[in-house]
Amino acid sequence: MPLQVSDYSWQQTKTVVFLSLPLKGVCVRDTDVFCTENYLKVNFPPFLFEAFLYAPIDDESSKAKIGNDTIVFTLYKKEAAMWETLSVTGVDKEMMQRIREKSILQAQERAKEATEAKAAAKREDQKYALSVMMKIEEEERKKIEDMKENERIKATKELEAWKEYQRKAEEQKEIQREEKLCQKEKQIKEERKKLKYKSLTRNLASRNLAPKGRNSENIFTEKLKEDSIPAPRSVGSIKINFTPRVFPTALRESQVAEEEEWLHKQAEARRAMNTDIAELCDLKEEEKNPEWLKDKGNKLFATENYLAAINAYNLAIRLNNKMPLLYLNRAACHLKLKNLHKAIEDSSKALELLMPPVTDNANARMKAHVRRGTAFCQLELYVEGLQDYEAALKIDPSNKIVQIDAEKIRNVIQGTELKS
């Protein structure tokens, strides 16, 4: 049974009540204060202080200060008035219990509201942080898009400048050809004049004894005109026999059927042209040639302009999707730009088109395996990468660089297995 404390002191003004309560030597850590607008309780075992306040107070702005073995309360009144007593008099036990329960419910509701307000504030903070993060990501995405657009514009300008240079070079060549033709025509005219003069001299010498008449000059002129017209050329025919292509493979190792199939696929690939593309109407004839676009992409790759090179290979593939070297070269560009999945796709497509395997396409197949293996290794798929490198070594066992890289991949795989 706690001991009720009655030796407290209090003072008041119209707006504030000052209450001083001695702790009687109890440690501050063991003191519990509970306060609502009508009820104040201080529990510091074995002592207990309860006050059923005379009028409501503002418990949120009220304060309690502990020091010198005393608690000093500063209680702000809700209504400015003087109290007759600190606690309400004539309150029975049931009334006290109801006030206690009501105060506890009020405190619980206030704590619940505070918790909900704190949770709502936390949600708002999270929402704000998410919106800021999304804004930053959007700015980064826009920055990347702008960089891509700038690169595309730069590549387009370079391509246009190169086209203009080619056009001017062609115009210069055309002017030079026309000048040469004019010079040849002048030479031919001079030669004809000389021939006419020689013919005229011979005719005059042969007709010295002939009678001179009035129309002799006209007859000679007509004869000269007839002689100056060359006779029609004789018709002839030339027979051409093409030399059949011979593969440099020993007869005992020959794959004649596969080699013929490979030649047939190459011929079909050169004929497979897709001209139903809207952009073709703005291009020159030479720019509609996949071979020309492939060479252009190779030059751009050599200058490390990989995005422009990919654009050139893309258009070439749209024109002709049967040329394996286009996919093989585009895979190299994707490797440089770290587009590893696209590099794997292009290398696989190149290997698909480089069938059947013959000596003529061995080097291209070796490169395709190496590029796909490199992409797998950069994705940390070392087993798949080693399989491609071993396939490349089967094609070219004497390639020292591929041997060294394959050995490095084996060491990485063995190290990973040991760690696991």
Curated annotation (Swiss-Prot):
**Biological process (GO), any one:** epithelial cilium movement involved in extracellular fluid movement
Determine if Nucleus is one of this entry's keywords. yes
A family per Pfam:
CS
A single GO CC term, please? dynein axonemal particle
Q: Which GO terms describe its molecular function?
A: nuclear estrogen receptor binding
Each TPR repeat, start to end: 290-323, 324-357, 366-399
UniProt KW keywords = Cell projection, Cytoplasm, Neurogenesis, Nucleus, Repeat, TPR repeat
Q: State the superkingdom.
A: Eukaryota
Q: What does this protein do?
A: Involved in neuronal migration during development of the cerebral neocortex. May regulate the stability and proteasomal degradation of the estrogen receptors that play an important role in neuronal differentiation, survival and plasticity. Axonemal dynein assembly factor required for ciliary motility.
Q: What is this protein called?
A: Dynein axonemal assembly factor 4
| Organism of provenance | Gorilla gorilla gorilla (Western lowland gorilla)
